[in-house]
From Swiss-Prot:
Lineage, broadest ranks: Eukaryota, Fungi, Dikarya, Ascomycota, Taphrinomycotina
Name of protein: Folic acid synthesis protein fol1
Region feature DHNA 1, mapped onto this chain: 55-167
NCBIfam families on file: DHPS, folK
Reaction equations catalysed: 7,8-dihydroneopterin = 6-hydroxymethyl-7,8-dihydropterin + glycolaldehyde; 6-hydroxymethyl-7,8-dihydropterin + ATP = (7,8-dihydropterin-6-yl)methyl diphosphate + AMP + H(+); (7,8-dihydropterin-6-yl)methyl diphosphate + 4-aminobenzoate = 7,8-dihydropteroate + diphosphate
Gene Ontology molecular function: 2-amino-4-hydroxy-6-hydroxymethyldihydropteridine diphosphokinase activity; ATP binding; dihydroneopterin aldolase activity; dihydropteroate synthase activity; kinase activity; metal ion binding
Ranges for region DHPS: 467-733
Binding site for (7,8-dihydropterin-6-yl)methyl diphosphate: 511, 546, 565, 637, 677, 712-714
Amino acid sequence: MKSLVNLWGIYPFIRNNSLHGFAKIPRIVSTIPRQLRFSSLRHPTRQMDLIHDTVVVENLNTFAVVGQDQWKRKEPQPVQIDVYMRNNVQLAGEKDELKSTIHYGIASKLLRKEIEGSFFTTPKDLVNKIASLCFEDVIDTSHVSIKLTLPKCVLRSKNGLHYYAERERNSTSNFVDRIEFSDLELATILGIHAFERQEKQRVCLNISFANTEVEALEIARAIAEYVEQSAFLTIEALVVNLSKYLCFTKNLDDISIKAEKPSAITFANASAVQIYRTRSYFLQESLHKYESTKNKIAYLSFGSNIGDKFEQIQTALSMLHKIEGIRVLDVSPLYETEPMYYKDQPSFLNGVCKIETRMSPINLLRACQSIEQEMGRIKTILKGPRCIDLDIVLYEDCVYESEVLTIPHLGLQEREFVLRPLLALSPDLVHPYTHQPLQEALDKLPSQGIRLYSSFDNKKIINGALTMGILNVTPDSFSDGGKVSQNNILEKAKSMVGDGASILDIGGQSTKPGADPVSVEEELRRVIPMISLLRSSGITVPISIDTYYSKVAKLAIEAGANIINDVTGGMGDEKMLPLAASLQVPICIMHMRGTPETMKALSIYEKDIVEEVAVELSSRVEAAVQSGVHRYNIILDPGFGFAKTPKQSAGLLGRLHELMKKPQFKDMHWLSGPSRKGFTGYFTGDASPKDRIWGTSACVTASVLQGVSIVRVHDTKEMSKVVGMANAIRYVP
């Protein structure tokens, strides 16, 4: 393949600021074979037999439709043509006559006649037309070099688009054409000084690259958008990152960029940086950079649509934990998604995990493939059904391509089922070579109908809030103490389930303000027999154990409970969060300060209550994640009535959606527990907890309309009806 990669210096029509600086060399030099070009200049008499003469037509002006003009219209636009036609002028020079050479006047007329007013799809089509005319008998050259200029083609360019090409008659040589944008004038934030960060300044760009399948004007627009949205400190960073961005987003093999900063030096025209980069350079650089044994951060996507999808994912994550050189740092919520490419297959369960690893990208790929193979994945249909799928989505800021691996993942920016879980883990992630925030990419996608998955409702998809019925087996509960015992709990549980409870919450210790704690042994005596009785009697709905003792939680799960509901968010027992992680069960983490004995005195919020609750609850989520709890197993509770005055609880409920939309809580499930709380009676005038059903109804409605997944209530029959109506208001089209 003959390439124009080193275009600067090959042709006489290259700009004066060319890399090799030979713009003023006599034109006859331009077509000397490349390997002899410089020696021929030093010793012209030794290589005269190798010199190829040219006849030149410069700046031939005409007009034609060449693709789109600067306003994206298919309208005629000015065209300037430079043609360098190879021809031995020796005989014409000796005889001083025209018949032995190319008649440039005839050539000019022929070119104008055939081109003027014609329609060409691309600049390359026009170049091919010019070459074919030059090879005809009228002109009869065997080799032609062409510079095509469209001065009005690029909206932000002072001198438009230049297209450089070389053609040979009857040749199978695959010449690589080049495109240049000349004097692109853009504005961006650029500089290290404070005053340079306050206002955009002009930059002037000259960019050339090998012709590509991507439309040139699309590339020009991408350049303008990238540069004007950037805010680099140095011009070096601008050109390096721009070249990387274009190589990968526009599939360019190579690129040359010169960037001038006219306002940089008071007594000079401009400061400038000029670079040449290739796609392969970036790939090799990235690969070398990440071959070290230092720990790196990577993100893996996972999915399953065969068998018990949830269990398949749990198994794959457990296997990932056990691989030496990999540490799982965080796991996203889970999402059910319809198949995107091959449609005739079951829906998928998808998510993303964040890992720390010393492995290179290739070795990490092999580790993922080993898990797939061990779990029995068999690839039969491209993008078809699979028991497990593990892909490297991101690996630090690595850009890598090979026959077996591409990083970032090729489908990253078009897949909601990858972007959403990815951003749930790291909301501020940017694309490695576009530097576009991934949140912007997600915002641009049309909804792909993915649904948040629930690990606490018998592993179903939630289509609205669920009702959690409260079964307190405590003698001193603030609302219903002493009303549930082993004699009536089964009847009570069946009644709640029949009335609409999707989850039962069993508690053996009062957490009302001022309540004294009971011992672990006493709480175990109260709750374990109850859970065992319910399970042995055929109660199948999920059971939540309301406790902050890890031992109680462990034995309750072994007895048949499914969920841990810890009002202290793991602060009451340091073993609670690691226990939830090891058991791989959902845990509800509530916002609370102090203990039930002390929390009333801790209701002072110096700043905005939503912001303070967000910070404190976020710290508990982080503690859970660091303990190994996966985000899909975390349920959050704002803690109405706990270390909050009635007005604070009501205000927090009214702004619950603000708390839920914080980036650190993206797509997490929420529980609301306002039932019969003091603040509901404070505003309705109901002193007795059993009379607070109307205030509770209003709070439940407000909670559901703001998107909570669970409401925890005493009056199951009435509140299930309220939840049903609120779900209809929020979710029914």
